[in-house]
Amino acid sequence: MSEFIAENRGADAITRPNWSAVFSVAFCVACLIIVEFLPVSLLTPMAQDLGISEGVAGQSVTVTAFVAMFASLFITQTIQATDRRYVVILFAVLLTLSCLLVSFANSFSLLLIGRACLGLALGGFWAMSASLTMRLVPPRTVPKALSVIFGAVSIALVIAAPLGCFLGELIGWRNVFNAAAAMGVLCIFWIIKSLPSLPGEPSHQKQNTFRLLQRPGVMAGMIAIFMSFAGQFAFFTYIRPVYMTLAGFGVDGLTLVLLSFGIASFVGTSLSSFILKRSVKLALAGAPFVLALSALVLTLWGSDKIVATGVAIIWGLTFALIPVGWSTWITRSLADQAEKAGSIQVAVIQLANTCGAAIGGYALDNIGLTSPLMLSGTLMLLTALLVTAKVKMKKS
């Protein structure tokens, strides 16, 4: 309890938000997301240049996610009392190094090393994002600051693939990663200029990461996080075959649907701080319930293009509340161990993404076209019920 009080006293001492630092963190996160998904739009030229198949080249994305999962779990135990400012600078350096290694890769092995560097930065940065945010702004401003960071994520997710595809045709895939390295250098300088000293955890406050799961409501929260993200990836990973077959969209129509989804996600993220100020628990229970209903509507009436488009927009708008909401939950309910809680959260999300996509794919191949929707809807409904019944929430 003394640790919790000490942490909150430190937070209360922040009377004015450091928006420059918040935006530097948001920019760095956006760069990480863009670089994570660049290979998706550059697989063919990368594979041809390196003399490998597109399937093998695609493992560069898998390696990043795999390394990120483990990095998120162990980063806080590794860095311990190190000033977080230097740690964030290191992550920006790893981002830049990753881009350069990929750009100059003449073998698949070097490509994987470069992508592993990105995984270290990605997992570590995500694990620390909530705790960094709560140390840069006053407590009541944390949801707004988190919405800025996740808004940057939404923008990055929308532009990553089309930007990579366009620039790849224009300047070649290697120069695309060189340009990304230049963004990494900008991240380094912006962080050095704006991020204040953020001392690490004193030795007497060290606590085993997984002991946090013994606290009331924490295990339920992590299970809810797992189910909500698994439900998201069970649906979104297979949105192309579902929408093209069930609703009859062509490639151009699907592109517009995905763009609408991305814009709705950005709008939802932008509005999330206002909703979360009213009730974090209501948002975390209400959002998956709306998504469960959306999955049901799409399953029953998804052959209508207007209905299918409407569901995509509602889904993007609503799901945007979930990542911001759970990060806000950590900053409020686990404020004394926000870094360690963030580590577990990121690992759970990475595992959920993998499981959701894998099980959704199995269901699609072996049960039927709408089975990923039913799986997603079921997981979202269970999430809403679990949050309502078991997840504990501290007031700000």
Swiss-Prot record:
Membrane topology qualifier: Multi-pass membrane protein
Record keyword Transport present: yes
Cytoplasmic side: 1-21, 76-85, 129-147, 197-215, 277-281, 327-343, 388-396
Annotated TM spans: 22-42, 55-75, 86-106, 108-128, 148-168, 176-196, 216-236, 256-276, 282-302, 306-326, 344-364, 367-387
HAMAP family, per database record: MFS_NepI
Its biological purpose: Involved in the efflux of purine ribonucleosides, such as inosine and guanosine.
Record-given protein name: Purine ribonucleoside efflux pump NepI
Protein species of origin: Escherichia coli O157:H7
Lineage: Bacteria, Pseudomonadati, Pseudomonadota, Gammaproteobacteria, Enterobacterales
Gene: nepI
